[in-house]
Design a protein with these regions (language model features):
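Flexible "arm" and connector segments at domain edges
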Residues: 1-78
Length: 78
């Protein structure tokens, strides 16, 4: 991985981490304030996480990840 690729990877990882924290925060707000509707905020953050997760996934083994997803879906009956 050259310097530019590494810089892009770090940027994407940082953005993913930021969006994961924002999603976790929105979900905790919904749990802690059940009379307030945070569904739109949660949906927005899920979308943001998906975008950056797709960007980061390209640096990892897609076959391995897909296999793990299948196993987890079976394990938790999802």
């Amino acid at each position: 991985m050259n310097y530019q690729d590494f810089h892009n990877f770090r940027f994407k990882c940082n953005k993913l981490t930021e969006e994961l924290v924002e999603l976790a925060t929105a979900m905790l707000q919904q749990r802690n304030k059940p009379k307030t509707d945070f569904h739109r905020e949660i949906e927005d953050e899920i979308a943001d996480v998906e975008v950056w997760l797709m960007a980061v996934k390209q640096y990892y083994n897609e076959e391995y990840i897909n296999n793990r997803v299948s196993i987890k879906k079976q394990t938790y009956d999802l």
